[in-house]
Swiss-Prot record:
The lineage of its organism: Eukaryota, Rhodophyta, Bangiophyceae, Bangiales, Bangiaceae. It is found in: Plastid, Chloroplast. Binds directly to 23S rRNA. Might be involved in E site tRNA release (Potential). One of its GO terms (biological process) is translation. InterPro entries: Ribosom_uL1_bac-type, Ribosomal_uL1, Ribosomal_uL1-like, Ribosomal_uL1/biogenesis, Ribosomal_uL1_3-a/b-sand, Ribosomal_uL1_CS. Gene3D superfamilies: 3.30.190.20, 3.40.50.790. This is Large ribosomal subunit protein uL1c. PANTHER family: 54S RIBOSOMAL PROTEIN L1, MITOCHONDRIAL, LARGE RIBOSOMAL SUBUNIT PROTEIN UL1M. It comes from Porphyra purpurea (Red seaweed). Part of the 50S ribosomal subunit. GO terms for molecular function: rRNA binding; structural constituent of ribosome. GO terms for cellular component: chloroplast; large ribosomal subunit. Belongs to the universal ribosomal protein uL1 family. SUPFAM superfamilies: Ribosomal protein L1. Keywords: Chloroplast, Plastid, Ribonucleoprotein, Ribosomal protein, RNA-binding, rRNA-binding.
């Protein structure tokens, strides 16, 4: 059984076992984030969904108005004019068949992979490499597109993808714990609005079940969902 560090025990003692408002939770998150690096602020949201049913699956993207605080490295696979567009738009890595070959051999030094629709049949063979890492291009994620410039700018500017896992939980970053409180609150509110907007048609009963915040190395803080609805 994994031991809880003395540091985490101390931080947990600062969080009462109660439900907090969104603003209170963000204040505590910032106060309990004291690692020697810039910790990511994370939301962990349990929804009343069973993703084994097609009409209860949820996968979407949202642009955080205050960004993620992370430098996102974008790779693009395209041909001809679209490849040139990618290079001009600031893609960190770009290529065609040769980049597909490099990825198949283990090159994964990027955070997002964007591709044009015409090249997707060639990328299909990379499913085993990209799939488990959440890097496989997808229309739903906005990573299969002809608008290469827009997609690159959005991901570098704060666009994040979220989806429910097998247990109906969403794990999504919403900035760095060092962000001003009002910026974190704004990003969280944007995520909440997006989840409501993209509510699956098959959702039954209570949609929002639990909502926790934490920093990378910090304790969990539970939000009072009724204060958001």
């Amino acid at each position: 059984m994994k031991k809880t560090s003395r540091r985490l025990k101390t931080l947990k003692s600062k969080v009462d076992p109660k439900l907090y408002s969104l603003n209170e939770a963000v204040t505590i998150l910032r106060a309990t984030s004291n690692a020697k690096f810039k910790e990511t602020a994370e939301a962990h949201i349990s929804l009343g969904l069973n993703p084994k049913y097609a009409d209860q699956q949820l996968r979407a993207t949202v642009i955080l108005p205050k960004g993620t605080g992370k430098l996102v490295k974008v790779a693009v696979i395209a041909k001809g004019e679209k490849l040139t567009e990618a290079m001009n738009a600031g893609a960190d890595i770009s290529g065609s068949e040769e980049l597909i070959d490099e990825i198949s051999k283990g090159r994964l030094d990027f955070d997002k992979l964007i591709a044009t629709p015409d090249i997707m049949p060639l990328i299909a063979k990379l499913g085993r490499v990209l799939g488990p890492r959440g890097l496989m291009p997808s229309p739903k994620a906005g990573t299969v597109t002809l608008d290469i410039t827009k997609s690159i700018n959005e991901f570098k500017g704060g666009k994040v993808e979220y989806r429910v896992d097998r247990t109906g939980i969403i794990h999504v970053p919403f900035g760095k714990s060092s962000f001003p409180e009002e910026d974190l609150v704004m990003n969280l509110q944007t995520i909440k609005d997006s989840i409501d907007k993209n509510k699956p048609s098959g959702s039954k009963g209570k949609y929002w079940k639990t909502f926790f915040l934490s920093s990378t190395m910090g304790p969990s803080i539970q939000i009072d969902i009724t204060s958001l609805l």
